[in-house]
Structures are given as C-alpha cells and as structure tokens.
Amino acid sequence: MSETPIWPPRWPRAHGGPLAAGDFRATPEDFVVEEVFDFAPEGQGEHLWLWIEKRDLTTPEAAKRVARACGVRPRDVGYSGLKDRVAVTRQWLSVHLPGREAPAELTATLATSGIAILDARRHPRKLKRGVHRLNRFTLRLTGDIAEHPGLSRQWQTLCEAGVPNYFGPQRFGREGRNLIMARSAFARGWRKRDDPHGMQLSAARSFLFNEVLAARLRTDCWRTPRDGDVLALAGSASRFVTETVDATLLDRARRGDVAPTGPLWGKGRQESGAEVAALEADIMATHAALSQGLEAAGARMDRRPLCLRLETPALRLDEEGGVVVSFGLPRGAFATAVLRELMQHPVL
C-alpha cells in the first residue's frame, strides 16, 4: 500500500545536517544560473539563436514572449533546459526564421518584459531539449549561514565527497502538489492530455528515486557500490552492472570515476541485481500506486547517479556580508541538493 508522506519528506542529509538558517533567493539576483554548452551556433542557417538573460520569468513564458515578438508559433522556439523563475538566468533560445531577419525592434520589445538579448547567431538546426552539458550556478547566501564559523569546512567536505543527487522541491510543486496530482491521475488512469508536459510523471519518478537514495543514505552506501549496483561512468551516459564489488571498484567510486545509480521508474527491465534490486523492489512495493501507475502510463525505465559531484566549486565573501558560492552541475541536477547540505530553509 502506498503511503501519503509528510511534506516535505524528511529525506536524510549526508554530511551532518545543515549548519544554520539562511536565505538564497532574497532577490532574483541572488540566484544566477547559466547554461554551458560544448558547441556554439555556426553563424548561418534557418534558426536564429538568441543568448538571453531573463529575470523573474520561467523559460516557457520567456519562449512565448520571444515567439510573439518574432511573429512565429510557440513551437518554432526551442530551448535546452527549464530554468528557475525567481532567478537571473542565461540560456540559448532558437527561433525558426527561414529567409528573414528578426524584427528590428526585437531587443527593445523583449527588454520591456524582463528579457535581455546578449548575443544572436544563426544555426542550421533548432535547439533541442537537454543538449547543454551543465548549469553553472552563482548563489548568494544570506542570514546566519553567512557568518557560521564551520561554513568553509562544510563546503570543502561537499566539494571533496559530493552530495546526494536528490530531485529538488521544484519538481514536486508547492506542498507536493504535482505528486498529489500524480496519485489522483494514476488512480483514475493517467492520460497525456491531462498532463501534456509530463509534470505528474516526473514528480512520481523523482519521488521514488529520492526514496531509494534516502534508503541508501540511511545505510551509508549512497556512494559505495554494492553487489548488483548499476554504476554510471563520470562524464558520460555509459553504465554497467557489477555482480561483485572489489577493491578496484571501491577505489574508483572514492575518486568519483564511477557512481551507483538509482531507478527512474517505469516500464522496462530493472537493470540492477542482487541486494540492490531487492531494496529497489521493496520501495516500489511500498509505493505501489506510484510505481505501477508509472508503468501503466508508459514511462520508460532509466537510471540516475545517486552521488552528485560539483564542478569547479568556489566560495567567497562579498562586500555586503553575504557568502557567494559557485559551482557547475550536470543538467537535471538541482542546486538545492547542494544547499540543503549547508543550510536550513523552508523549501530545503
């Protein structure tokens, strides 16, 4: 029988809990995100790529405003990732403009609606979802956390050991609303037309993944491979199953070369084996309404690393008494997974 969890769930932390209370979004300027790509627009083609900076605006809404300003359909605008609303974010959008230029007043028009065009280049193809390599975060922390004497030491621990790769609260909606809607949808039979963007499916899969990760944390094996683990290779989409853990694998895991993964539940073969498969099956049985609902809806089984490593992390004090942390995370990872290991906040 599926249980209705306390919200937010009390998923465990990895490094001794948060140090002190604080804020990280007092203003949009406190939360800056920039997409990082491994390629650049070629300079010619049917699609005009716009490097934009948006403030206090969701990515879908920004795309709609760009489409309207360019006189094209919303589906003619592409973007790689969904960025936070209460933030300053920089990302590419592509606009299908074959044989014509963008309106002369485009920059001025968008500037009035919270969107600045920082660069514009042509490219032969539309920007597809999920093609950026990582997101670069620059976050300003204020409140008690900024003055805590243990902050630098805790930050160094996160940089060296990594953090649990939890899906963040944004995935579940306010007070877990997306998950509540998923439960209702599965009870009556999920339909794509009622969930066109897949938010309910994503919330259910994310919750189950977080439950598996939490169980591994409670036994302190979220970074350490176990028999039957599906291990992800750092910096690639490759993964493999280990039947027996040896000293070489343990050393590779300590160095961050490989990481255990957890399930993004759906229809298909469960890749894990042995004790790992048994643990995952027990959790899916506990939340059968969600796991079976995902299978019936046709979501495809996938995996996600349990441990999240920070790329080029840095910490500094600013002139106003706050602390600024910066780091890169692979696409699909949440900055809140890092922040919850540092500080207390209602959404963490």
UniProtKB/Swiss-Prot annotation:
UniProt keyword Repeat, yes or no: no
Gene name in the database record: truD
Protein function: Responsible for synthesis of pseudouridine from uracil-13 in transfer RNAs.
Entry EC no(s): 5.4.99.27
Family per similarity comment: Belongs to the pseudouridine synthase TruD family.
Species this chain originates from: Chromohalobacter salexigens (strain ATCC BAA-138 / DSM 3043 / CIP 106854 / NCIMB 13768 / 1H11)
Gene Ontology cellular-component terms listed: cytosol
Enzyme class of the recorded protein, top EC level: isomerase
Keyword NADP recorded: no
Catalytic activity field: uridine(13) in tRNA = pseudouridine(13) in tRNA
Protein name: tRNA pseudouridine synthase D
Active site: D84 (nucleophile)
GO biological process, one term: tRNA pseudouridine synthesis
